[in-house]
Amino acid sequence: MSDHNPLTLKLNLREKIAYGMGDVGSNLMLSISTLYLLKFYTDELGMPAYYGGIIFLVAKFFTAFTDMLTGFLLDSRKNIGPKGKFRPFILYAAVPAALIATLQFIATTFSLPVKTTIATALFMMFGLSYSLMNCSYGAMIPAITKNPNERAQLAAYRQGGATIGLLICTVAFIPLQSLFSDSTVGYACAALMFSIGGFIFMMLCYRGVKEHYVDTTPTGHKASILKSFCAIFRNPPLLVLCIANLCTLAAFNIKLAIQVYYTQYVLNDINLLSWMGFFSMGCILVGVLLVPLTVKCFGKKQVYLAGMVLWAVGDILNYFWGSNSFTFVMFSCVAFFGTAFVNSLNWALVPDTVDYGEWKTGIRAEGSVYTGYTFFRKISAALAGFLPGIMLTQIGYVPNIAQSDATLQGLRQLIFIWPCALAIIAALTMGFFYTLNEKRFALIIEEINQRKNKEMATEEKTASVTL
């Protein structure tokens, strides 16, 4: 990159692809737990479903605070070496993340309390290593580019990478696991393959992405976990985005956790999950590709809200008419196409709130903003893991037998009605309370640049007087 106006400077395609590879890697490791770990607990380890829900709640709540710890570490960095401010965390945390992602799917013959303890500890350790790796990855966008359109494109590439990782996991994990006559061995081997793949993609991201604008933390600014919370509540656009994301991520993860049960017990075809994943994730990829163009034409907020409408419509159609394989896949494609815009813009909007925070406080703290934001995401993920486990117990789910009509109806409500309701809440929150539009953002960036130019001129004048 040459030294031009950072607001108009464009990134090369290679760097955008490399950044997207980071979320391919992250999601290859994360999605195996999001999609299949609860089922592994209930069907292979013999845990009651509510045990699995409690494990998700405890571990995800713990990792919400490890996200804060990551922000503290990022914002505390003073002596930044040639690897950059964020990239070293990607490099060094990817190894334990991949290792623990595999260990979570190792079946043991211990008693139920011991199994539960081990599962909880492993999930918490995975969350810690994943926080160090993924929060740093997400917080890196403002250091890569200051161009708002390029940020939207990076977010689209990130969401595209996440979708590819999720697609591979949805389509390939169960077929790989089914290759082994012993299902417990199948889970372990499939998890190992996905973890190795995830690690490789994280290394490709590390090698291909550069931090072009590294802002060191001011000397008088001391990072703290408390400041991560303050970064949220003193930044209204960030707070609104956090609340909306709390709803959207919970809705999305509930759908992912329940779809394996829905295809097996409601539609009586667990292999349909691979086909559904192929088509619906394909629709997400199409949506992701359309994000930069639609944002340029209509603006981020309008595209976000349109995605929420599509999501809700798809779920409503599926609840009433998705009783066979064809209509289930078709209406799921509509819903997932809508999520492409929502999930992409969840990340594209965060860098804008970083700049808003700098404009308002004079302190640029990407780590605090991003980890405050991911704190809400982890709370959302905790609820998304906890609620299915509890609700599976409430609706009378028993593994590996034909389910009652009441249980089947409960599964339909879990996968369609709950996510739809959360999507509507998120849409109302963003529609009425998010006020950081493109025009206002441009004025904020202009004022920040004027401040910095004034500070530089003052420093140069002081230096010349001293000499």
PLM feature spans:
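Membrane-embedded alpha-helical bundles of multi-pass transporters/translocases
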Residues: 2-467
